[in-house]
C-alpha cells in the first residue's frame, strides 16, 4: 500500500468529471487500498478518486468512530433524496477551511462494491452528508462551490498563503 497525493483547491484537475469504471481489476483493488490509506493518514472520513488525480467514479468512506467500517462505492448514483440538513464541512482538498453546506437529510445510493457486486444503501446523518460531498467530487464540484464568490475568494487566498508558507 502507498499514500497518494491529494490535489488541493484551486487545482483545476479537481474540476474534471470522473468516468465510470468498466472492469474490476487488481489495479483497482490497489487503488482502493491506497485511497483508504491516504484517507486515514489525512484523518478524513471520505475520499473520491478525483481528489487523488484518478478520474474514475470511485469513492471510499469510513464515518465510524473506530475507523473500522470501510465502505467502497464504485460508479455511485444518487437515486433518491429527502429532507434538508447540513453541517460545517471540511475537505482534504481544501485544508484548514470549513463552511456550512446544505445537503439532503436522507439519501439512497446505488453502486458496485469492491468486488463489482451491485448494492443499494440508505443513509442519513454523517454518512449521507459524506456520500453527497464525495459524489460531488466525481462531477467536479467542491463544497466551496456552494459558497458566495466572496467566501470562495477568501478561501482561495488562505490556501495560496498556506502553500507559500509550506515552501
UniProtKB/Swiss-Prot annotation:
A biological-process GO annotation: co-translational protein modification
Pfam families attached to this UniProt entry: Pep_deformylase (PF01327)
InterPro entries attached to this UniProt entry: Peptide_deformylase, Peptide_deformylase_sf
Active site: 134
Binding site for Fe cation: 91, 133, 137
Root EC class: hydrolase
Cofactor(s) needed by this chain: Fe(2+)
Catalysed reactions listed for this entry: N-terminal N-formyl-L-methionyl-[peptide] + H2O = N-terminal L-methionyl-[peptide] + formate
Its biological purpose: Removes the formyl group from the N-terminal Met of newly synthesized proteins. Requires at least a dipeptide for an efficient rate of reaction. N-terminal L-methionine is a prerequisite for activity but the enzyme has broad specificity at other positions.
Identification of the protein by name: Peptide deformylase
